[in-house]
Design a protein with these regions (language model features):
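Short beta-strand segments in beta-sandwich/barrel cores
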Residues: 43-44, 68-73, 96
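Short, conserved beta-strand element in jelly-roll/cupin
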Residues: 54-72
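Ligand-binding loop in jelly-roll beta-barrel domains
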Residues: 91-117
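Short acidic-glycine-tyrosine-enriched beta hairpin
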Residues: 74-93
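Conserved short histidine dyad/triad with adjacent acidic residue
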Residues: 35-56, 79
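Conserved GNAT-family N-acetyltransferase fold
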Residues: 36-38, 63, 88
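A short, N-terminal "cap"/entry segment at the start of jelly-roll beta-barrel domains
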Residues: 1-37, 45
């Protein structure tokens, strides 16, 4: 029988750093949760593409925005900007960048294992 668990997202199991950003990864039960920190000037094109070597991000994301703003552009040209309090589902085939001069902080739900290639 499964037991209840309690963990703090402020004490991650692992931290992944890369140019202008980091992901704090926490596993609880069979779910991965991540807290993302992206600096102004971060973009998928400049900071992640060189690491994963694909034309766009091939992972899906479910995110909750804590602070800052981020814009996603799908391969088909569709774009959407997200800010504090927004929930976002982003399917594979996109690029993203931080909008403005404020850092972006968000919670990534359930898909953080995909970031182990970073």
């Amino acid at each position: 029988m499964a037991k209840m668990q309690k963990k703090s997202i402020n004490s991650p199991d692992e931290t992944r750093t890369f140019d202008k950003g980091k992901f704090d990864l926490t596993k609880i039960g069979d779910t991965s949760i991540g807290k993302m920190y992206l600096e102004p000037g971060w973009s998928w094109e400049k900071c992640v593409k060189p690491l994963v070597k694909s034309q766009s991000c091939q992972a899906s994301h479910t995110q909750y925005v804590i602070s800052g703003r981020i814009r996603f552009k799908m391969n088909d040209g569709n774009e959407e900007e997200y800010g504090p309090g927004d929930l976002a589902y982003i399917p594979p085939g996109h690029k993203a960048w931080v909008v403005g001069n404020d850092p972006y902080t968000g919670i990534e739900l359930g898909t953080m294992d995909l970031f182990h290639s970073i």
